Swiss-Prot record:
SUPFAM superfamilies: P-loop containing nucleoside triphosphate hydrolases (SSF52540). GTP binds at D81, V82, R83, S84. HAMAP family: RapZ_like. It comes from the Bacteria. Displays ATPase and GTPase activities. InterPro entries: P-loop_NTPase, RapZ-like, RapZ-like_N, RapZ_C. One of its GO terms (molecular function) is GTP binding. This is Nucleotide-binding protein AAur_2084. Pfam families: PapZ_C (PF22740), RapZ-like_N (PF03668).
């Protein structure tokens, strides 16, 4: 993992998970170009309600509103930065008012080396919000001075100089996710080929090589959710080997998805009508894949009942 600094009271080397207080309010700030947008996206992926570019004077009002609906918005992240121009000068006053009112919060400060920030602005072909008619580096210098006191009092200072987008998202996950390391949500979906391929499928497994229960009169009215049909499908020659090999083949792919900070994937299992074979195989694959670490499996049957 890329290096970062997590500071809680005193600065420490490496990433230390930050134990959340009772009130889940996180103020996200830091240098322009240090990755606030990526951090916001990562927080949203883990259930945080994110408000971007909020004037600091509105922090107390928003926190008060959310405090009356903790079940609706249990985790609130507010992004405040120099884009609010003159309004940002009141940030310390606003944070002091939060503390005085008894609202518990944390401050995440994202930072990066000047040369890295300059390169990111140049690559994005965007001016620094404070550079005016000067250079990007001039704007960075002004911003550092404006944010100096805020950085000194931040609960977490995260240096993103060595991070790419995925590395930063992973760091945010480790620091602020209730579940810790990245969890992949895998939806195993049965479907019928005659109704078309699922447009959101990352993988497609074809179960049409299995003998079709449709041609067995006593099984035809039932579905792959019924035990008799499931036993017939999963007991057919080659099916268990197919399932075993498919699960093994997916293991490095799912590991890679997590490393790339991908949170969602869909495995589609198809047969002709989506009633018998694909349903039974999807259920078996779901059971096997649910044993993977940090994989949450759901099962859906797109075309079941469509006939």
């Amino acid at each position: 993992m890329d290096e970062a600094t997590a500071k809680s009271g005193t600065e420490q080397d490496g990433l230390t998970p930050v134990k959340p207080p009772e009130a889940e309010l996180l103020v996200v700030t830091g240098m322009s170009g240090a990755g606030r947008s990526t951090a916001s996206d990562a927080l949203e992926d883990h259930g945080w309600y994110v408000v971007d570019n909020l004037p600091p004077q509105m922090l107390g009002t928003l926190a008060e509103i959310v405090s009356h609906a903790p079940k609706s918005i249990p985790k609130l992240a507010v992004v405040v930065d120099v884009r609010s121009k003159d309004l940002f000068t009141d940030i310390q006053t606003a944070l002091g008012a939060l503390s005085a009112s008894g609202i518990t919060f944390r401050v995440l400060f994202l930072d990066a080396n000047d040369d890295v920030l300059v390169r990111r602005f140049e690559q994005g072909r965007r001016p620094h919000p404070l550079q005016g008619g000067g250079r990007i580096l001039d704007g960075i210098g002004i911003e550092r001075e404006v944010l100096r006191e805020l950085r000194e009092h931040a609960d977490v200072v995260l240096d993103t100089s060595e991070f790419n987008v995925h590395g930063l998202a992973t760091a945010i996950t480790e620091l602020f996710s209730d579940t810790g390391p990245v969890t992949l949500r895998l939806n195993v979906m049965s479907f019928g080929f005659k109704y078309g391929l699922p447009v959101d499928a990352n993988f497609v497994a074809d179960a049409r090589f299995i003998p079709n229960p449709h041609w067995v009169p006593q099984l035809r009215p039932h579905t792959g959710l019924d035990e008799d049909v499931s036993d017939y499908v999963l007991g057919a020659e080659g099916v268990q080997e197919f399932v075993d090999r498919y699960v093994r083949a997916l293991e490095p792919v799912l590991d890679g998805y997590r490393q790339e900070n991908k949170h969602y994937a869909t495995l589609a299992v198809g047969c002709t009508g989506g009633k018998h074979r694909s349903v039974a195989v999807a259920m078996e694959l779901s059971k096997r894949l649910a044993q993977y670490p940090r994989v949450t499996v759901t099962t859906t049957h797109r075309d079941l009942g469509r006939e």
